[in-house]
């Protein structure tokens, strides 16, 4: 059994026919029967947007008549001068002689352990992390320690700590 639509005003309702009768029914079926040409054209136009309401792009009745983005370049000095700064945040930042201290990121438990494994503090730079990693790898490498198991474990811990810090974006 195959479904055949009942009609335009009966969405979700179907006749059940065998395949041959469905083909015959569909030959004579016209979704737009009874509609004028203008109604068919309107339906086809609305079908483009899935019969949802749309608005003309770029039209906003509430927008001020200022320059558009295409008329001003955001990177130009003029655009920065025209920028509204009602709370004075930008002017205060310009007035400061130096940059503010970067906010310290709160370390996760594993990140703190990784820094501890490398013998570093949370404020270590990328260069500090890499230098500590290289020194500890050389110191605890199995070839440098004659196969000492304790040193091998430390070697693995150093590698894991460095990889974790690398994945976390510290180096």
UniProtKB/Swiss-Prot annotation:
Superkingdom: Bacteria
Residue ranges of domain J in the record: 113-170
Pfam families (UniProt xref): DnaJ
Biased segments, Polar residues type: 57-77
Region (Disordered): 56-83
Protein's name in the database: Uncharacterized 19.0 kDa protein in cobS 5'region
Organism, as annotated: Sinorhizobium sp
């Amino acid at each position: 059994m195959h479904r055949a639509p009942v009609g335009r005003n009966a969405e979700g309702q179907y006749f059940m026919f065998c395949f041959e009768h469905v083909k015959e029914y569909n030959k004579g079926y016209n979704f737009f029967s009874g509609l004028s040409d203008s109604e068919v054209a309107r339906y086809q136009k609305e079908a483009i947007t899935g019969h949802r309401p749309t608005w003309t792009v770029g039209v906003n009745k509430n927008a001020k008549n200022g320059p558009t983005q295409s008329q001003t370049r955001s990177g130009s000095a003029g655009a920065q001068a025209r920028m509204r700064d009602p709370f004075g945040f930008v002017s205060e930042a310009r007035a400061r002689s130096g940059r503010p201290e970067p906010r310290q990121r709160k370390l996760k438990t594993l990140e703190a352990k990784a820094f501890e494994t490398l013998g570093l503090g949370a404020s270590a730079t990328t260069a500090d992390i890499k230098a500590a990693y290289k020194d500890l790898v050389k110191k605890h490498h199995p070839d440098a320690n004659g196969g000492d198991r304790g040193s091998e474990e430390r070697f693995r811990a150093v590698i894991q700590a460095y990889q974790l810090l690398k994945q976390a974006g510290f180096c």
